[in-house]
Amino acid sequence: MELTDIHCHILPGVDDGADTMEEARKILRLEYRDGVRTIIATPHYREGMFEPAMKQVVKVYIQVREMAREMGMHLYLGCEYHTNSRMVKDLRRRRRPSMVGSSYVLTEFSGAHNYEKIRNQVYDLLTEGYQPILAHIERYPCLREDIQKVRELVDLGAYIQMNAGAILGESGSPIRKFGRQVMEEDLLHFIASDAHGVKYRRPNLGACAKYVSKKMGHSYAEKIFCENPDHILKEARRQANLRARKRNKAKEQTT
């Protein structure tokens, strides 16, 4: 089973993830050893904390993408966007990338955000044609303490991501039990490493995939680690084709 990691802070020097190109290379090696063949790099964007210039992000991404290619891996560019009032406008104007240029958006909240705040942001994104993936929901008490709220967000149209460490129990037994409940109630769409380096929050998708396969079955693990991530890439290709057709049509109208 070839895994896809949709949430990884592998680009050095743009957030609190990898520090150097050498550390990025080590992350790639660990991911490859775990069975990961596709990674979506998701540097943070958080107002007042992580605001890397897009030119720098793209420059570093191209370098790491080449390292990945040499290892037989695919690397794509996304973003972990910490929600703010300008989020939809920034996405529309392409100031920050969605997930691989698709309509999927990896959306982060603060632990202090209440359910109403999360629901309103999900609704706003959906209304504008985006498909929000809620990053590491195990960190949000308002969802962790009431799984019905998770179900309501999924019914609204949101997608749910949890970190591999949380599923494996690295964040404590209560969070591991929450993860098991989310899986058993079929509310989980993605599990990702959220790796930040080789010492702190190392890649661990391989161990998690084995655990999920044992607890939930191989077909369930394939859906979470392979099939659902592939939907992002397919949607990205669809969006790219739409943009290309629009550009061609605009050229035809000016000639």
Residue spans for each PLM region:
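Extended substrate/RNA-proximal surfaces in nucleic-acid metabolism proteins
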Residues: 51-161, 239-255
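Active-site beta-loop-alpha junctions enriched in small/polar residues
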Residues: 9-11, 44-45, 78-84, 110-112, ...
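Mid-to-C-terminal alpha-helical segments outside catalytic/metal-binding sites
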Residues: 205, 210-255
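Non-catalytic positions within long, well-ordered alpha-helices that form the structural scaffold/packing
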Residues: 32, 126, 183-184
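Metallo-beta-lactamase
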Residues: 2, 9-18, 147-154, 162-165
